[in-house]
A protein has these predicted regions:
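Replace the tail clause
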Residues: 1-122
Length: 122
């Protein structure tokens, strides 16, 4: 059996596509956010959707790499969000991206969040 991360029980096709990545992905849940706070690790938030071409490219080039996953797992609490399942979360961080960069966002969207308040930092 393949090694899986915390996404293997999800119903979203997009999240399930990432359930066997070496990245230790977690879904966006209160339990996951609480664990990130307890561990005091910054959150690496990745938002995308199953029909997104560039999301698949990023997954193949980054999230399937053991070397990149090792760095992500060591330094971050990794959370993956399907924008089609959680448009509320997507909207919050797309707006935050636009405010921070003065440019519209897109997908995949990667943000670094403070685990204490889920606010982006850069």
């Amino acid at each position: 059996m393949s090694k899986t991360n915390k996404l293997y029980k999800e119903t979203s096709p997009y999240l399930l596509q990432h359930s066997e990545n070496p990245v230790d992905w977690h879904p966006w849940t209160e339990q996951s956010l609480k664990k990130a706070r307890t561990m005091n690790k910054p959150i690496l938030l990745s938002i995308g959707y199953s029909a997104c071409h560039w999301c698949h490219v990023m997954a193949h080039e980054s999230f399937e790499s053991d070397a990149i996953a090792d760095v992500m797992n060591k330094h971050f609490f990794n959370i993956k969000v399907d924008r089609e399942e959680r448009p509320d979360i997507d909207q919050i961080y797309q707006i935050a991206h636009q405010i921070i960069t003065q440019r519209p966002g897109g997908w995949p969207l990667t943000m670094f969040l403070d685990p204490k308040n889920n606010q982006p930092f850069f």
